Amino acid sequence: MAKFKIRPATASDCSDILRLIKELAKYEYMEDQVILTEKDLLEDGFGEHPFYHCLVAEVPKEHWTPEGHSIVGFAMYYFTYDPWIGKLLYLEDFFVMSDYRGFGIGSEILKNLSQVAMKCRCSSMHFLVAEWNEPSINFYKRRGASDLSSEEGWRLFKIDKEYLLKMAAEE
């Protein structure tokens, strides 16, 4: 399959984006943790001040999925700021359906993300990869990615909504 197109997502792609988010979550054994809705995606990504940006990989009709989907991959990203090095592109989610891997779709998405990062004068792209996900780790390392967990000793933390509410209410 030589034909596919990488393009910015539109509001009409939200159902496909959610479908792929759920497929990625299933791949990562976290399917039950997706609570996001299509409405959330629409409001959060396509309003006046979008919280995220998204690229999608689209194949022509002769390569649609058996279920009739033309969108077979996506990358969700946003911009953040590091006070030491400046602007960063943060890659939140990146997924290509298993039947469509090995055709250069993932590489082309990453190329497009790199072009976006350079156009916006970002100093780097950051992302997380599950420790067990060797195929993805190798995919990124082949393209020059560094593992900051092992090289710099950073640890990822989160504060859940319950605790955010508690701290926000403190007097």
Swiss-Prot record:
Protein family: Belongs to the acetyltransferase family.
GO biological process entries: polyamine biosynthetic process; putrescine catabolic process; spermidine acetylation
Pathway terms, separated by semicolons: Amine and polyamine degradation; putrescine degradation; N-acetylputrescine from putrescine: step 1/1
Keywords (A to Z) from UniProt: Acyltransferase, Cytoplasm, Transferase
Intracellular or extracellular location(s): Cytoplasm, Cytosol
Annotated catalytic residues: Y140
Main subcellular localisation: cytoplasm
Residues the entry annotates as binding acetyl-CoA: 94-96, 102-107, 133-136, 140-143
Keyword rRNA-binding on entry: no
One Gene Ontology term, aspect cellular component: cytosol
Coiled coil: none
Function of the protein: Enzyme which catalyzes the acetylation of polyamines. Substrate specificity: norspermidine = spermidine >> spermine > N(1)-acetylspermine. This highly regulated enzyme allows a fine attenuation of the intracellular concentration of polyamines. Also involved in the regulation of polyamine transport out of cells. Also acts on 1,3-diaminopropane and 1,5-diaminopentane.
Subunit structure: Homodimer.
Protein name as it appears in the record: Diamine acetyltransferase 1
Annotated substrate binding sites: Y27, E28, E92, H126, F127, L128, E152
